[in-house]
UniProtKB/Swiss-Prot annotation:
Binding site for Mn(2+): 153, 216, 269
Domain VOC: 7-121, 150-273
Species for this entry: Geobacillus genomosp. 3
Protein name: Manganese-dependent 2,3-dihydroxybiphenyl 1,2-dioxygenase
Reported temperature dependence: Optimum temperature is 85 degrees Celsius.
Entry keyword annotation includes Oxidoreductase: yes
Pathway(s) annotated for this protein in UniProt: Xenobiotic degradation; biphenyl degradation; 2-hydroxy-2,4-pentadienoate and benzoate from biphenyl: step 3/4
Record-listed E.C. numbers: 1.13.11.39
pH dependence of this protein's activity: Optimum pH is 7.5.
GO biological process, one term: catabolic process
Database matches in InterPro entries: Fosfomycin_Res_Enzymes, Glyas_Bleomycin-R_OHBP_Dase, Glyas_Fos-R_dOase_dom, VOC, XylE-like_N
Family of this protein: Belongs to the extradiol ring-cleavage dioxygenase family.
Domain of life: Bacteria
Length: 315
């Protein structure tokens, strides 16, 4: 049976100012602190069932420790390990409990250096009394901060996106949903998923020529009014909203608001809307160079090439 990826699981970040990063993600964004292991703090949104969807660890510079994907079956982890090794990829085994709340996993790097993790076994702790939702199909009751529902996607940049698109398709079963093709034929970005979401991962070209960078990761809010409320909360705490405010992407049809963690500089997208794909024979949507601006910004603040939105952090 072919090994399959089920979903985007979590992202593990290194931050040079752990205290400020925890303040931002826990107290302002409204993620729940679930657990601690040494200096690492594990968090999740009120609708996330798995042990954590974000971990924060102190370090001397901001970088991504790993981007994690959950498989559909327990045996898929071993199968992925064997397939990757057969193709010459170095695979590191992570023992149960080495990452709090998680079973046996593998870590490896893509050809351009992205650090990935694949796992299946994971704890799903219940919310403590006093935070538990009265709705049996929720984990926590949303009670403070921006309070996104769940983790959504990750967006990474590299020098040649097409190579990574093909690698993800061939090795992990991702499907292309939308992409940008320039006049010279170069594919500048692609939005891919293994779920019905319009994207679980976006891979785009880095205009600075860096091979393995994190542009942002995203948490999902239920509706656009939550995005507007998030903007108010950020401004009340004197946190800069990138590009000056929220807007809507043409690609993915999603509403967005971008903000950097003041402790690390890692960029967070607060994301709402989008669309789901159920067609097994989906034809990827091509955006051409003359349509690029509408694809990136359907309406809202202008995203200027060479501006602050080109900033990324290390993978």
């Amino acid at each position: 049976m072919t090994a399959e990826i089920a979903k985007f699981g979590h992202i593990a970040l290194i931050t040079p100012n752990l205290e400020k990063s925890v303040w931002f993600f826990r107290d302002i964004v409204g993620l729940e602190e679930v657990d601690r292991q040494g200096d690492t703090i594990f968090l999740r949104a009120w609708g996330d069932w798995e042990h954590h969807t974000l971990s924060l660890t102190p370090g001397n510079r901001a970088r991504v420790d790993h981007i994690a994907w959950r498989t559909k079956r327990p045996e898929d982890v071993e199968t992925f390990a064997e397939q990757l090794k057969a193709k010459g990829t170095e695979v590191q085994w992570i023992e149960p409990g080495e990452e709090k709340g998680q079973g046996k996993a593998i870590r490896f790097r893509l050809p351009n250096g992205y650090p990935f993790e694949i796992y299946y076994d994971v704890e799903k702790p219940k919310a403590p009394e006093g935070k538990k939702s009265r709705l049996k199909n929720n984990v926590y009751r949303p009670s403070y901060g921006i309070a996104p529902r769940r983790i959504d996607h990750v967006n990474v940049w590299t020098t040649n996106p097409s190579e990574i698109h093909q690698w993800l398709k061939d090795n992990m079963g991702f499907k292309m949903r939308e992409y940008i093709r320039l006049n010279n034929g170069f594919v500048a970005g692609g939005w891919m998923s293994v779920t019905p979401l319009v994207h679980d991962i976006g891979v785009m070209v880095d205009p600075k020529g860096q091979p393995n960078r994190l542009h942002h990761f995203a948490y999902y809010l239920d509706n656009v009014t939550d995005i507007l409320r998030a903007a108010d909360i950020l401004r009340e705490h004197d946190i800069t909203i990138e590009m000056g405010g929220p807007g809507r992407h043409g690609i993915s049809q999603a509403f967005f608001l971008y903000v950097k963690d003041p402790g690390s500089g890692h960029r967070l997208e607060l994301f709402s809307g989008g669309y789901l794909i159920f067609d097994p024979d989906w034809e990827p949507i091509e955006w051409q160079e003359h349509e690029l601006q509408e694809g990136l910004i359907w309406y809202g603040p202008e995203m200027k090439p060479g501006g602050p939105m080109d900033d990324t952090t290390e993978c």
